[in-house]
Regions:
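Short cysteine-rich loop/turn motifs with clustered Cys
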Residues: 1-24, 50
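Amphipathic alpha-helical interface surfaces
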Residues: 21-24, 43-47, 73
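Histidine-centered catalytic micro-motifs
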Residues: 23-31, 48-55
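Short linker/helix segments within small regulatory modules
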Residues: 29-44
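Glycine-centered helix-coil hinge/cap
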Residues: 30, 55-61, 73-74, 93
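Short flanking/linker segments adjacent to small metal-binding domains or redox-active Cys/His motifs
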Residues: 71-97
């Protein structure tokens, strides 16, 4: 396996990236400028195409999977930035916990 693919796996299913299974960057928070804010705070995850875009479980087709990632992203942001819930909501517009 080429070095560029070592240790990269899907955040949800842990499928390892290969030449034939490329991982895609998913911005945890999107819409109304939140994609750029996600970039700024490192709130992105790598997903295989199936977990990213394929029904029925792909994050863009499944509200439960999306909520799981929103909750993960909120916890990560609050922990890494030292924010309380109110600060998170002031930046991202919603509490997901």
């Amino acid at each position: 396996m080429p070095k560029e693919f070592e240790h990269r796996k899907c955040f949800l299913c842990e499928r390892v990236e290969t030449e034939y299974n490329r991982l895609e960057v998913h911005h945890i928070f999107q819409g109304r400028g939140r994609r750029q804010i996600s970039d700024r705070y490192g709130l992105t995850v790598l997903l295989c195409h199936k977990c990213h875009n394929e029904p029925p479980y792909g994050v863009h087709q499944n509200a439960d999977t999306m909520l799981l990632l929103h909750q993960y992203g909120q916890r990560k942001a609050m922990q890494e930035q030292g924010w309380d819930c109110e600060t998170f909501v002031s930046i991202f517009g919603k509490n997901y916990l």
